[in-house]
Every structure is written in structure tokens, then in C-alpha cells.
Amino acid sequence: MKPFSMRACLLAGVAVLFTWPFAQADQMQPAAPFVMGYANRLSCVPGEEVSFHLSASTDSVGLVIERVGGKRVKVFEKAKIACATQPIPDRASSDGCHWPAAYTLKIPDDWTSGYYEATLTAGEGKKAARGTLFFVVRSANPGKNSPILLQLTTNTYNAYTNWGGHSLYAYHDRDGLQGHRVSFDRPLRSQFRTWELPFVQWAEANGYALDYAVNSDLEFHPEILKHYRLVLSVGHDEYWSSPMRDHLEKYIAGGGNVAFFSGNTCCWQVRSEDRGRALTCWKQWYNTDPLYRQGDQKLLSTLWSHHLVERPENQLTGVGFLWGGYHRSHGQFMDGPGSFRVHRPDHWIFAGTGLKRNQRFGGKDTIVGYECDGCEMKWVDGLPFPTHGDGSPKSFTILASCPARWAPGDCYWYDRFPKDREGAAVLGIYTQGGTVMTAGTTDWSHGLRGNDPAVVRITRNILDRLSK
């Protein structure tokens, strides 16, 4: 989430609806030298083909592909791939670039599941231009090499990417406006390095094998879920479609476990379009969503916690942004501790940590930071209990918390939100078929990067217990 002024909101509501359809001229090219591109798939399995759609100021480009995990491992290299400068359509952000494929690769059978980064090079020497794109390789035999599936937050990558001029945010938009549709068929800005990579590096260094997928695989390949004991969400997992939720909630009801080492999770409902190559989200302008006037308001592309949708993310994760907010970000609790205060130290999640009631952990690496999720709480004898009035499951237990608050500008995103209400980042757990653990913060993995003893032990406890 990003705060914005009310004036920007009002401008966006007009411009998104009336300006975009009439602007059709191609956009200006970046200054030479340049190279950029995207893959036609977010994920694939060995034996399938992935195509690279490229544009460059040179007539050929170099391509190096590496698997990025505990180590960077080069798996493929090719020089002098024929290329050309491709037009950038005015609506590239929403409708895609429609560039031809410059190169198509069949994924070798020996490529392991993981995050793969392709580095593109145009020109030579110090004046060469470089760009990157990514794709994910799923396991050809789900669950064979790992009982743990990490699904990457690729919907959020796309939502924040403003390449082509627009994203789902106004703060970095070409015209200061907010889009309502974003395409994967354009160069994307990955957020993998910020949150998921520190988790992956720690996991692989400590003997935890992971299989990989992307957000949309929960929607279009839900059959893979049954092969795993534990599904992970790490970092900033903000944008979810209804089929994604349906399939993961069915998995949990059937006994599958989920660990949300993430925050601001499942905040906005999106609708997949173009067979998963685009996302629609009208956000705070829910009454301009075409579904609003059709009466099908359960699928409105707005906050999951909105009173018209009536499906708060708490029902899935145990917590939500409505009772969370920011910590050390957006002007909220900028001098806050950045750490969790323990409430129930005897829970198995804290085994081996030595933590006691009211003791804090994670502050060295500010594991409570940026965006946080919480639940409505009541305090009895110094201990917090969920009220369950916000959708948190009846078995949800609050294990630790830290204060958080919405930024004032965000209150306009929800038409029944009381201003200045304090929330919290909540670390908690519930069982409803399977077990669901939630960290309630985007920045949990930073504690793994910093090797915080408590964060490391808690993470081990969760992975060891829930992956069995």
C-alpha cells in the first residue's frame, strides 16, 4: 500500500475512466543503449518452452540465465540473439507490449525448481546496457524433492511495476494517476530480492529444500497443492484472486498447512484476465468496477475486508490489514521497536528460544516493519485475545504483537474506517483442518538475513513441525 492525497484520488477516478481509452500513440523509447524484455510465462516445468520477448537498441543481445537461491548458479548462456527496437504501445501497462519472441528455450529436464533470472546485455564493454527478466521453474514431480511449496508474490510485483507509465498506484505514475489494470506482458520489477531471497538463502543454507510456484499457480494449477504438506508466503503478498483463495482454503480444510511469513497479505482482491497475463483491481474506486452495477459484489476488485465483499483476509490468514497498518513506515511509529512482544512463551512455536512473557525479539533487524497485519483484540489479565468480530477463526491464538497504524491518507480507501485507530502486527496461529501460522509483517525474513537467534529458531520450529 502507498498513501496518496485526496486530490490525487479524485483525479485518478476521472482520468482512469475517461482519459486512457483515447490516448493511443506509442511512447518514446529510452535513450540508447538499452535492452529490456519479459517472459511469456511466469512459471513452467521442465520440458515446457518459455519465450523471451525483447527490445533493444542493438541488433543482437546476449542472454545469461542463472538460478538465484542460496547461490547464483549459471545454467544457460547464448550470445548474439537477433533483436530490434520494438514499439512501446501507449497502453503497454494495462494491455501489454505484444512484442514478438526473440528467443524460445525448452526448459531442460535437469533444471531444479527455483527462481531464474535472465540477464540481457546489449553492446560491449563499459558502455553495454543490461536488463533482467525472471521466470519460475516448478517441479515436474511436485512434492518429490520437498514437502514445502514456496509461492512467490508475483501479483504484487506486477501491481507495483510502473513500466509503460502506469501501475495500480498513483505515487509513481507517469501522469500522477492510478491504473486499474496491469499486464504481465511488459518488463516487470521483481521484489524477490527484498523479501523472498533472504528467506530462500537461509533455507537452502540450512538444509531446507523448497519447491517454487507463483501466485497465479494457486489459481491455474491448484492440482499441485495436494502434493505438499506446507505452503509458504513470504514478504509482500498483497494481491489475491478469488480462485487463489478458494483453492488454498480448500487445501487447508483438507489438512494442508500454510505459513504466512508475510504482511499486507491478501489485502486486495484482483481478477485475472487474459488467461492470467493481466490483473484488474479498482481498489478504492470499487463503485467504478463494472461488477458493482451488475450486483455481483462478492468479486469486487477492492479490499477483501470491504463490507460489500464480506470476505476479510482474516478468514484465511487469521489477521488483516484493517486491524494492522504500518510500523517504521509511512510516518507511523517511526521510532517504534521493530520487534515482537511475546505473550504466550509456552507455545511450541517458541520452543528452544528461551523467550519469556513480555520479552521482545527481532528488533535488531526490524522484523516488524513496513506493512503489518493484525486482528481486533481484547485484553484480559494482561493477555490479548481475538474478538473474532473481524473474521479471525475461532481457534486463532495471538502469540506476539507490536503496535501498528494506518497512514491518514489510507483511510479514504475504506469508506467505514475510523481514523487514528491503533492496530498491531500480530504473530498468531490457528487450526481448521490444517494449521495456519501468520507472522503479520512483511519483514520477517530480514531476521533470517541477520541471523537473529529467536527468528531463526521460531522459523525452524514452524518448518519442521508443519512440513511433516
Name these PLM-found stretches:
Residues 1-11:
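Bacterial N-terminal signal peptides that target proteins for export
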Residues 9-20:
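Bacterial N-terminal signal peptides
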Residues 26-34:
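Proline/serine/threonine-rich low-complexity linkers at boundaries of modular beta-sandwich domains
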Residues 38-59, 65-71, 78-124, 131-134:
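Ligand-binding face of N-terminal immunoglobulin V-set domains in extracellular IgSF glycoproteins
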Residues 121, 151-155, 213-217, 233-236, ...:
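Active-site-proximal beta-strand/loop segments in catalytic clefts of secreted hydrolases
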Residues 275-461, 465-466:
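Glycine-rich, aromatic-lined ligand/substrate-binding cores of catalytic
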